[in-house]
Amino acid sequence: MAPFQSNKDLISTGIKEFNVLLDQQVFDDPLISEEDMVIVVHDWVNLYTNYYKKLVHGEQEEQDRAMTEFQQELSTLGSQFLAKYRTFLKSKEPPSNTLPSS
């Protein structure tokens, strides 16, 4: 990392790193519940937010604005990941054995 990066560059780096984390996830047995995955993603967002909070600089208002933008981006990426995971879980559900009514 460069000795001095703008907050915009820091946010961009953090988002790229978070995307790498999400892309590395392998959905495999044993599967975890959707509720547990929500907790995991929430924890990841908090981890990245707390780490990057120490790196932003400038006036407090500028720092707050940068962190708000960063957290919103991470939450959006996390929501997209959870939607993909939800779809994956549904694809693993056994087919329903109900017969169509005649």
Swiss-Prot record:
Pfam families found in the cross-reference section: AHSP (PF09236)
Keywords in alphabetical order: Chaperone, Cytoplasm
Superkingdom of origin organism: Eukaryota
Keyword tRNA-binding recorded: no
Induction of its expression: By GATA-1 during erythroid maturation.
Keyword Cell division annotated: no
Localization annotation: Cytoplasm
Major localization listed first in the record, in broad terms: cytoplasm
Tissue: Expressed in spleen, bone marrow, and blood, with highest levels in bone marrow.
Listed SUPFAM superfamilies: Alpha-hemoglobin stabilizing protein AHSP
GO molecular function: hemoglobin binding
GO biological process, one term: erythrocyte differentiation
One Gene Ontology CC term in the entry: cytoplasm
Function: Acts as a chaperone to prevent the harmful aggregation of alpha-hemoglobin during normal erythroid cell development. Specifically protects free alpha-hemoglobin from precipitation.
Family affiliation: Belongs to the AHSP family.
Self-association and partners: Monomer. Forms a heterodimer with free alpha-hemoglobin. Does not bind beta-hemoglobin nor alpha(2)beta(2) hemoglobin A.
The protein's name: Alpha-hemoglobin-stabilizing protein
Source organism per UniProt: Mus musculus (Mouse)
Lineage summary: Eukaryota, Metazoa, Chordata, Craniata, Vertebrata
Gene that this sequence comes from: Ahsp
